[in-house]
Amino acid sequence: EEIEDPRAEPGMVVVDVKAAGVSFPDVLIVQGKYQFQPPFPFSPGGEIAGVISEVGEGVADWKEGDRVIAMVGNGGIAEKTSAYAATLMPLPESMDFKDGAAFPLNYGTTYYALKQRGELKKGETLLVTGAGGGVGTTAIEIGKAMGARVIAAASNQEKLDIALSLIHI
C-alpha cells in the first residue's frame, strides 16, 4: 500500500532512510507479540541511518543533508521516515549507513544494562551469554572498554568464534 511521505512536524525531521536495522523487537511487532502494536498500516524498523531531508519548526541543531542515526520506534523500513530531533545522533563519515543503522538498539541496550543497571566497574568479571548475537557482541566491546574481565558464552562454535574475535581486540 502506498502511503504519503512523512512531513517534518514541529520538533521533528524527515530522514531519507539509507539503511534500517532489523532487531528482535521488530520480529515481535510483526508477529503481534510485542508490548505495543502500531496501528495498521505500518512499517517495522525501529532504528535507522540516513540523511535529513526536511527540518521541522523549532529544530535548531540539525539541517538538511546531515547524516544521522535514530531510534524511531517503527516505520524505519521505508524510503523516508520522521524522527524527533532529540532522538537523533550524528553519523560520522567514518561509519557507513549499514553499521549506523545497527548501532542504536544494540549499543544503547548494552550500555544501559552495564552502566546504569549493572553498575559494572573496572576489574569486575562480566559473563556475556549469547555472546555471538547483536547485544552480546556489543556487551563484549563495551565491557572491555569499561575495564571488565569478559567471559563469553554462546550456543555453538561459529558464535563463539565471533565472540573470541572481539575478546582479543
Describe the function of each predicted region.
Residues 2-5, 49-51, 69, 80-82, ...:
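Conserved hydrophobic/aromatic beta-strand scaffold that supports enzyme active sites
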Residues 4-22, 33-75:
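Glycine-rich beta-strand-centered segment in the early N-terminal region that forms part
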Residues 23-29:
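Adenylate-forming
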Residues 28, 39, 61, 67-130:
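NAD(P)H dinucleotide-binding glycine-rich loop of Rossmann-like/cofactor-binding domains
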Residues 50-52, 65, 91, 110, ...:
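Residue-level signal for nonpolar/aromatic packing positions in well-ordered secondary structure
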Residues 57, 93, 155:
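Short, conserved catalytic or interaction motifs in soluble domains
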Residues 101-103, 107-166:
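Mid-domain Rossmann-like dinucleotide-binding core that forms the NAD(H)/NADP(H) cofactor-binding site
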